[in-house]
Amino acid sequence: MSIEERVKKIIVEQLGVKEEEVKSESSFIEDLGADSLDTVELVMALEEEFDIEIPDEEAEKITTVQSAIDYVQNNQ
């Protein structure tokens, strides 16, 4: 499974959205209905899945599906 597929799978599980709703340009809050707690839990799930640490200042920049994919790809 690619990084993109793994990230999207985590988003589907964490936010309870349908897979087809999760597009690269989707914003977690505006498009996928996440709140601030959801985004924190999403970052924690990404850290666990990919065995990385995401500092708070970086986590705040992860607001879309693509930004999550890019962050993981650049920090693995």
Curated annotation (Swiss-Prot):
Principal cellular location given in the protein's record: cytoplasm
Compartments reported by the entry: Cytoplasm
Keyword match Acetylation: no
Cited PROSITE patterns: CARRIER, PHOSPHOPANTETHEINE
Record PTM O-(pantetheine 4'-phosphoryl)serine, positions in chain: S36
Recorded GO MF terms: acyl binding; acyl carrier activity
Signal sequence extent: none
Statement: the UniProt record of this protein carries the keyword Lipid biosynthesis: yes
Domain Carrier: 1-76
InterPro entries: ACP, ACP-like_sf, PP-bd_ACP, Ppantetheine_attach_site
Any single GO CC term annotated in Swiss-Prot or TrEMBL for this entry: cytosol
GO BP, sorted A to Z: lipid A biosynthetic process
UniProt cross-references to Pfam families, sorted A to Z: PP-binding
Keyword annotations: Cytoplasm, Fatty acid biosynthesis, Fatty acid metabolism, Lipid biosynthesis, Lipid metabolism, Phosphopantetheine, Phosphoprotein
Modification after translation, per record: 4'-phosphopantetheine is transferred from CoA to a specific serine of apo-ACP by AcpS. This modification is essential for activity because fatty acids are bound in thioester linkage to the sulfhydryl of the prosthetic group.
Pathway: Lipid metabolism; fatty acid biosynthesis
Family annotation (NCBIfam families): acyl_carrier, PRK00982.1-2, PRK00982.1-3, PRK00982.1-4, PRK00982.1-5
Described purpose of this protein according to its UniProt entry: Carrier of the growing fatty acid chain in fatty acid biosynthesis.
Family membership noted in the UniProt record: Belongs to the acyl carrier protein (ACP) family.
Protein name: Acyl carrier protein
Organism: Actinobacillus succinogenes (strain ATCC 55618 / DSM 22257 / CCUG 43843 / 130Z)
